[in-house]
């Protein structure tokens, strides 16, 4: 694990961009997993700034809320409005490379099956994943003390009882998250301080802090603007 702290956000974004370039060859067919949220949009903006062209990369959501694509709670909607549409306008990516999960209340099983097939027909694993960590330590839609946190299958599954609204979501499973080739974890904002300390602590469990699922990943970059407590300075 490489751990980087800075109160200079641009420095962290530059380190993210460097790590991305070390792990993703834009001339090769690659899969990139992203979650929603303001921190993710902020870090992705470095690609706009750099006029980075995604010729062969495909983006998939690591989690999504079971809402219409135009709903204000949709991760796809947030990311499309604030990042992908701008990349399309600059001719840096085709919108077809951003794969949405289309939820169907009438046929939930087919909806998630189709999204799994959409990924599996193109890739075996994710080449690169960037996820932000929630206040409770959750990543994607893997929340503390939820059954999905301990799933041993690959791909996407439903979370029917999320502690955050809306309660019904899909999420990439722990096995698929850990199986990715490279991972970036973001702990951004003082409200994530407890989550960061639980992530670093030796006596904390995955059940308390799901982000710990990725702590032993062989190619993990952790970025934070949260000043660490002295007790964790040597972690």
Swiss-Prot record:
Q: In which pathway does it act?
A: Carbohydrate degradation; pentose phosphate pathway; D-ribulose 5-phosphate from D-glucose 6-phosphate (oxidative stage): step 2/3
Kindly state which reaction or reactions the protein catalyses: 6-phospho-D-glucono-1,5-lactone + H2O = 6-phospho-D-gluconate + H(+)
Q: What gene codes for this chain?
A: pgl
Which GO terms are recorded in the biological process aspect for this UniProt protein? carbohydrate metabolic process; pentose-phosphate shunt
Does the keyword Hydrolase feature in the UniProt annotation? yes
Asked whether the keyword Lipid metabolism is assigned, the reply is no
Source organism of this protein record: Borreliella burgdorferi (strain ATCC 35210 / DSM 4680 / CIP 102532 / B31)
Which keywords does the record carry? Hydrolase
Q: What is this protein called?
A: 6-phosphogluconolactonase
First-level EC class? hydrolase
InterPro entries assigned to the protein according to its UniProt record, in alphabetical order? 6-phosphogluconolactonase_DevB, Glc/Gal-6P_isomerase, NagB/RpiA_transferase-like, PGLS
Which purpose does this protein serve, as stated in its record?
Hydrolysis of 6-phosphogluconolactone to 6-phosphogluconate.
Highest lineage ranks of the organism?
Answer: Bacteria, Pseudomonadati, Spirochaetota, Spirochaetia, Spirochaetales
GO molecular function per UniProt: 6-phosphogluconolactonase activity
Q: What family is reported?
A: Belongs to the glucosamine/galactosamine-6-phosphate isomerase family. 6-phosphogluconolactonase subfamily.
Pfam families this protein is in? Glucosamine_iso
E.C. number:
3.1.1.31
């Amino acid at each position: 694990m490489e751990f980087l702290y800075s109160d200079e956000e641009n420095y962290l974004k530059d380190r993210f961009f460097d790590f991305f370039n070390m792990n993703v060859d834009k001339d090769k067919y690659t899969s990139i997993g992203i979650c929603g949220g303001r921190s993710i949009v902020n870090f992705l903006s470095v690609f706009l700034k750099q006029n980075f062209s995604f010729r062969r990369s495909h983006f998939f959501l690591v989690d999504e809320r079971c809402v219409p694509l135009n709903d204000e709670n949709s991760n796809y909607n947030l990311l499309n409005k604030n990042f992908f549409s701008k990349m399309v306008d600059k001719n840096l990516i085709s919108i077809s490379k951003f794969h949405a999960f289309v939820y169907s209340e009438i046929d939930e099983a087919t909806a998630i099956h189709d999204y799994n097939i959409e990924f599996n027909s193109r890739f075996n694993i994710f080449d690169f994943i960037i996820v932000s960590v929630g206040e409770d330590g959750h990543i994607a839609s893997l929340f503390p003390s939820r059954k999905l946190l301990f799933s041993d299958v690959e791909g996407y599954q439903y979370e029917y009882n999320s502690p955050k609204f809306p309660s019904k979501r899909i999420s990439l499973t722990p096995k698929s998250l850990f199986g990715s080739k490279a991972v970036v974890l973001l702990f951004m904002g003082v409200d994530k301080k407890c989550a960061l300390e639980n992530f670093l602590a030796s006596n904390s469990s995955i059940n308390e802090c799901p982000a710990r699922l990725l702590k032993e990943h062989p190619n993990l970059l952790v970025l934070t603007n949260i000043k660490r407590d002295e007790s964790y300075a040597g972690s």
